[in-house]
Amino acid sequence: MSPVLHFYVRPSGHEGAAPGHTRRKLQGKLPELQGVETELCYNVNWTAEALPSAEETKKLMWLFGCPLLLDDVARESWLLPGSNDLLLEVGPRLNFSTPTSTNIVSVCRATGLGPVDRVETTRRYRLSFAHPPSAEVEAIALATLHDRMTEQHFPHPIQSFSPESMPEPLNGPINILGEGRLALEKANQELGLALDSWDLDFYTKRFQELQRNPSTVEAFDLAQSNSEHSRHWFFKGQLHVDGQKLVHSLFESIMSTQESSNPNNVLKFCDNSSAIQGKEVRFLRPEDPTRPSRFQQQQGLRHVVFTAETHNFPTGVCPFSGATTGTGGRIRDVQCTGRGAHVVAGTAGYCFGNLHIPGYNLPWEDPSFQYPGNFARPLEVAIEASNGASDYGNKFGEPVLAGFARSLGLQLPDGQRREWIKPIMFSGGIGSMEADHISKEAPEPGMEVVKVGGPVYRIGVGGGAASSVQVQGDNTSDLDFGAVQRGDPEMEQKMNRVIRACVEAPKGNPICSLHDQGAGGNGNVLKELSDPAGAIIYTSRFQLGDPTLNALEIWGAEYQESNALLLRSPNRDFLTHVSARERCPACFVGTITGDRRIVLVDDRECPVRRNGQGDAPPTPLPTPVDLELEWVLGKMPRKEFFLQRKPPMLQPLALPPGLSVHQALERVLRLPAVASKRYLTNKVDRSVGGLVAQQQCVGPLQTPLADVAVVALSHEELIGAATALGEQPVKSLLDPKVAARLAVAEALTNLVFALVTDLRDVKCSGNWMWAAKLPGEGAALADACEAMVAVMAALGVAVDGGKDSLSMAARVGTETVRAPGSLVISAYAVCPDITATVTPDLKHPEGRGHLLYVALSPGQHRLGGTALAQCFSQLGEHPPDLDLPENLVRAFSITQGLLKDRLLCSGHDVSDGGLVTCLLEMAFAGNCGLQVDVPVPRVDVLSVLFAEEPGLVLEVQEPDLAQVLKRYRDAGLHCLELGHTGEAGPHAMVRVSVNGAVVLEEPVGELRALWEETSFQLDRLQAEPRCVAEEERGLRERMGPSYCLPPTFPKASVPREPGGPSPRVAILREEGSNGDREMADAFHLAGFEVWDVTMQDLCSGAIGLDTFRGVAFVGGFSYADVLGSAKGWAAAVTFHPRAGAELRRFRKRPDTFSLGVCNGCQLLALLGWVGGDPNEDAAEMGPDSQPARPGLLLRHNLSGRYESRWASVRVGPGPALMLRGMEGAVLPVWSAHGEGYVAFSSPELQAQIEARGLAPLHWADDDGNPTEQYPLNPNGSPGGVAGICSCDGRHLAVMPHPERAVRPWQWAWRPPPFDTLTTSPWLQLFINARNWTLEGSC
């Protein structure tokens, strides 16, 4: 048995917000607590016979410790408990290796520590009390300190990672021939197969006809592959509603929407992703992805891909992990479109129950409601699910650009409770694909079956069936634990690079077919991949993360980050080389046979070689699965569902007498569906990839309000795609048809603010979340589907894909609590010009902006199901509706024409919160007042202002006002002039009148504070409260940033000379890097010859750096930053002899430069290339293979979380060659990092660096001065330091991302005169590097 070594690490004094949150949570539960001390323990599985040598121990201690300290790691614990202390150790469940362990092991291997095969991290706490703590105190502390779904308590230090007991084989037969249906019923119960009575009868009869018993693995396989989750029985079934047989299935009805829309789908209803006809674009790609090579410009037809799905059950059980794997699964859906596609950007949405935030009263939340123990509380879902989705996207490198968040917990008039106990975690994704890769090839005998991605773990066994249980909570809790998955974005990123290499292969894509692994695991994905030809699969050929896995687990576990593909044998070497270069496992697990059967051979005892030869087994090898594909995947009898409508009990809305507009706003503006989503947008990357033209945040204060997300199809073009969301589930409690129409209307009134090719080109993903098999709900879903189909036919848009989740109910005690029926519409389309987008922020204060209101259901002011009703714990009777779809068609057309002619300044849709909220949000985002008068006689004020009838509010300038009004009115639309903008600034007044009577008059900053309050309350629970309070105070007073280009600033221009000199720069990336493509674009735009180089290339000797003048160390999360920011990357450079020598030689050459951004900045600091003692020789790095003693490190942001901000920086004087001529400029730039706080080894060193101009970049406040104010300084670095350079100026390390702002359309906000720039000032940084290389400087 391998020994487990323990390395204890004490806190270094700057650990982010987590310890503070932990302390506050503990003190809230244990008032008698007097003190908390913590340490980490790295539990290292050491497989060598001898214990680590002194040198190996030194490496391990360097990896685990802080390089600025010498004594923070020990082999014995730092925490020695006294008699009144409680010592607790918690960490991950040990049933499989965590992603953290996987990445640490990768680092260890890169540094020559081969005997390390597992490293799990535990947290240790010493809690001090005045008296000896009781067992009850220990139980409370343990419950507070760990997540029972993914973690466990360790009463003693870990001594072994070997499981205490081996799982049962579970390969035996189920005795249907002897016991009939009873045998299958027993297996159904024991394995949690979620088979209903129809399934039990069907499979019993089938195996009796075959005259054989199914194996346990086959029964499990059938349950997963044919679960509601996978087969969509309800949508494809025969429905009877109130005794009437529906002519078409719901799926057929949805497909019929294609008949009234333009035929621009190149893929629809397949692959979990759809695609529409795109455009010809120019783009960069490496010449040869199997080796280091230069980027070259190519041109081709790129289509737009979209997919959306939900991950509700796992998120309800374990919010963080469920959301990470939901995001990862949807990313794989995009990857696996056709024969491989490009991931570009994501969307996210969350629906949860009443939050019950401690100390924050939301009057509509009922404190008497009880919550089940097997689901996370809504507050945990709101924070941790969004943390999980954000963390996965951040580390993978996919920006999240749009979304929604909604809460509901309400008792209906009939006594029924409706709440999202089982939450919604929605994930959408937009991507692109080459036209040549649309169609998958049919499987042919002899094709190789390959699994690419992470090894097999005992994760998510039974997830597909578990999520199909009719009412969540009816399954056993053990099986709920088994269905939880955990994500590894680092592995997914490596897998994505393998797929992208195939897609970009110069001699053609070797992938014949590609499918992502999800519900049902290998059993499902390998059947889909091999259908209809059939395949033989061998268990010995899978890479196992756990040798104790049985055949059922190998076949059925939903371990994440895995895809399956087919390729022809001649392309085997290509895939092998790419996988090795990207360090991503690729396992050739079987072969297409052509016999139309799927056969799993368990040959682990006696492996069968690839050529079919091998040692003769003593007995025939077991085949846990041997099924005819037609029998499993072929057309099966439709299930019939007999449904009854159950009309809701209605009560008129009864608002308090004399309720003022301000009093109503005090509630409505704090409702999660209406309130600011800043707590979501600030922690998720919105710029990575460099293809983002419009993300959520708009205006001078970056207010999270954008209606539409826009991306480019290439860095080189203004052609792109737009997507927007629509969902109105609360209205479904009154009328599901209305909710469906409004979801479509909301998606289109959001999308309308981006210029698209044509309304009839718009396609939609429809995602249905409903408790469809409970009384009344299935009929409601059918009605909603009918209404959606009808309104889409009238509008000319169509559905081309989607998913369903039909078990949206949970058991709470003896009560079944259903979620509201929900339809999420994701509309998407091609953008011919990504710059022709309008945002909601008012842009022309001081009365220069005129406000227009286009009502799409004129004369209607219904309050049923609105935010106002919900805030008074009611629904009301009559919901708003899209009464005249033709109005939306005309309004869409007119608005698009105005965008094309650049006649609109801003625009926003009327939705949650009504007209008054729409107007206020535009003022909030523009940071200015407004003065409006709504002329609607004979209607009460609250109905006029808070009805959520679909509509648009627009800002136009005086010269264009008459023309805009005329265009709408000539189209027969109801277009009212409401008023104009007011003064600028947070103290400007908002004055709202109805029919001439003033009903609201308050400073915009005060109203905005109400709107931001719920978000800041949630933020205090996920970030350092002092930082949150600082941002909240700042928003009340800020005017907005001021940018500055001094007169001496060079006039940046794109080098145009054909055939001119192109210095060579290496875009160097490591495992987990994700900022390489935008970096390549920036250097290419500046005239460099740009090369794609990996650390593996340097380690293997595939290339050296002698011919390169520059190296760019890119952003991302190398090795997921598991040991600290860029620590793994620094270890690979320091301890790998070949790679380290190559980089040392490069640095010593006087004709070279380097740029480190974000993760690259963290790396250069660790290596000592920047930040060392200015008085020492900068060319010396110390002896080979010895870590540098850095002068500074990049540590956790003071906020304690990842920060995504559009911040300002000031360029100062100094020797940095890349910033020459830019001194004095104050420019906005993307910031996206979790560890950017510059920790200097001493105040003296900081003073020397500042005095010598070696910190040439500082975070700037709104006046352009260096600042430590949060969030203007997003990480809290002392003195506002944002960048460091070497003494000779050749090496520059910066935390912000100038490479994501080299094109004007990449900017998040451009005030005059920057809004007319055709070239971004940030391009000058890269041009400076080129100019320096051409000068021949040494």
UniProtKB/Swiss-Prot annotation:
The modification Phosphoserine is found at S215, S569. The keyword Transferase does not apply. Residues 1064-1302 form the Glutamine amidotransferase type-1 domain. The active site is at C1158 (nucleophile), H1297, E1299. Mg(2+) binds at D707, E746, N750, D909. Keywords: ATP-binding, Cytoplasm, Glutamine amidotransferase, Ligase, Magnesium, Metal-binding, Nucleotide-binding, Phosphoprotein, Purine biosynthesis. The modification Phosphothreonine is found at T619, T623. It is found in: Cytoplasm. It holds the Pfam family GATase_5. Pathway: Purine metabolism; IMP biosynthesis via de novo pathway; 5-amino-1-(5-phospho-D-ribosyl)imidazole from N(2)-formyl-N(1)-(5-phospho-D-ribosyl)glycinamide: step 1/2. SUPFAM superfamilies: Class I glutamine amidotransferase-like, FGAM synthase PurL, linker domain, PurM C-terminal domain-like, PurM N-terminal domain-like, PurS-like. ATP binds at residues 322-333, 402-404, 706, 911. One of its GO terms (biological process) is purine ribonucleoside monophosphate biosynthetic process. Its EC number is 6.3.5.3. GO terms for cellular component: cytoplasm; cytosol; extracellular exosome. One of its GO terms (molecular function) is metal ion binding. Its main location: cytoplasm. It comes from the Eukaryota. It catalyses: N(2)-formyl-N(1)-(5-phospho-beta-D-ribosyl)glycinamide + L-glutamine + ATP + H2O = 2-formamido-N(1)-(5-O-phospho-beta-D-ribosyl)acetamidine + L-glutamate + ADP + phosphate + H(+). It is an enzyme of class 6 (ligase). Coiled coil: none annotated. InterPro entries: Class_I_gatase-like (IPR029062), FGAR-AT_N (IPR040707), FGAR-AT_PurM_N-like (IPR055181), PurL_large (IPR010073), PurL_linker (IPR041609), PurM-like_C_dom (IPR010918), PurM-like_C_sf (IPR036676), PurM-like_N_sf (IPR036921). In the N-terminal section; belongs to the FGAMS family. Phosphoribosylformylglycinamidine synthase involved in the purines biosynthetic pathway. Catalyzes the ATP-dependent conversion of formylglycinamide ribonucleotide (FGAR) and glutamine to yield formylglycinamidine ribonucleotide (FGAM) and glutamate. PANTHER family: PHOSPHORIBOSYLFORMYLGLYCINAMIDINE SYNTHASE. This is Phosphoribosylformylglycinamidine synthase. The lineage of its organism: Eukaryota, Metazoa, Chordata, Craniata, Vertebrata. The gene is PFAS.
